[in-house]
Amino acid sequence: MNTLGRFLRLTTFGESHGDVIGGVLDGMPSGIKIDYALLENEMKRRQGGRNVFITPRKEDDKVEITSGVFEGFSTGTPIGFLIHNQRARSKDYDNIKNLFRPSHADFTYFHKYGIRDFRGGGRSSARESAIRVAAGAFAKMLLREIGIVCESGIIEIGGIKAKNYDFNHALKSEIFALDEEQEEVQKTAIQNAIKNHDSIGGVALIRARSAKTNQKLPIGLGQGLYAKLDAKIAEAMIGLNGVKAVEIGKGVESSLLKGSEYNDLMDQKGFLSNRSGGVLGGMSNGEEIIIRAHFKPTPSIFQPQQTIDINNQECECLLKGRHDPCIAIRGSVVCESLLSLVLADMVLLNLTSKIEYLKTIYNEN
């Protein structure tokens, strides 16, 4: 379907080369000050055309808020917003309108719906992720009210791994690299892929932490069975174009360890390690929430590739257009937005966990 979330619900619409894309964010509490500078900055972080390491397609990505905001504050009603597509070049896709691009959604969309929007992939395009970033900015405004911060960066490009994590450096980096020392090597790997008309995969690190030093995240976000925090995070991120795996905490490495090596021991001050990635039993345990999202190489490459057309005839696919050589770079920003949306949803869900919370609200009235 086209909706993410339960209490804070984002519904998106629009296609890559349509007039507009947009969303409706329902469930946002009233009285939250709308930070227009934050919204603009989040959109710029995802925006293309900023350097040679991302797509040359540079949309303005101005968010037009159509409802749910009055005199600078959320009203509690659905926040509707539009983002205009102004830099689409549909002619770049004329030569492939009847064939399936390898490892794209063309094949499955055509067989499911029987109708295919070949212009930039239509609804399956990562262009839709701009909506998630806009909605994530609103979620960040909510989380800021209770001292929760989400941030992200790149920890791996083409197998070249970061050795240090510096989220402040990532904000300044052209590729959002977390490790300044490894950044140039990672950039070279991307440039080599571009020279070879190829693409390259990568891994993003996303985390949530308390806005205040020496303070913890809220304990108990999420529910133990059918609204597990880690499950909702994984669902949101694996639903993003190009993400093939999501790890929480130690993730895959956990399967290689013994219990004595993995367990997070405790003392009176709290946990002595964070191999669980901030989630136990489907709920936040107060520690930083740590996620890794693994992105496949961009399937849009400029090498001749064998494929078939809509009549099942073999043919050659030679792409044109403007594409990211490494989707992990801009994808890291989208994952950060998705984590913000999931956490905001879980914050609202948590209001139902204790009768004391409801009494506090209604006894004040």
Curated annotation (Swiss-Prot):
InterPro entries, per the entry: Chorismate_synth, Chorismate_synth_AroC_sf, Chorismate_synthase_CS
Catalytic reaction annotation: 5-O-(1-carboxyvinyl)-3-phosphoshikimate = chorismate + phosphate
Names of the cofactor(s): FMNH2
Segments traversing the membrane: none
One cellular-component annotation, GO: cytosol
Binding site for FMN: 123-125, 241-242, 281, 296-300, 322
Details of cofactor binding: Reduced FMN (FMNH(2)).
Metabolic or biological pathway: Metabolic intermediate biosynthesis; chorismate biosynthesis; chorismate from D-erythrose 4-phosphate and phosphoenolpyruvate: step 7/7
Alphabetical keyword list: Amino-acid biosynthesis, Aromatic amino acid biosynthesis, FAD, Flavoprotein, FMN, Lyase, NADP
Domain of life: Bacteria
A GO MF label: FMN binding
GO terms under biological process: amino acid biosynthetic process; aromatic amino acid family biosynthetic process; chorismate biosynthetic process
PROSITE patterns: CHORISMATE_SYNTHASE_1 (PS00787), CHORISMATE_SYNTHASE_2 (PS00788), CHORISMATE_SYNTHASE_3 (PS00789)
Subunit structure comment from the entry: Homotetramer.
NCBIfam families named among the record's database cross-references: aroC (TIGR00033), PRK05382.1 (NF003793)
Function, in words: This reaction introduces a second double bond into the aromatic ring system.
Family classification: Belongs to the chorismate synthase family.
Name of the protein this chain belongs to: Chorismate synthase
Source organism of the structure: Helicobacter pylori (strain Shi470)
Lineage, top ranks: Bacteria, Pseudomonadati, Campylobacterota, Epsilonproteobacteria, Campylobacterales
Gene of this entry: aroC
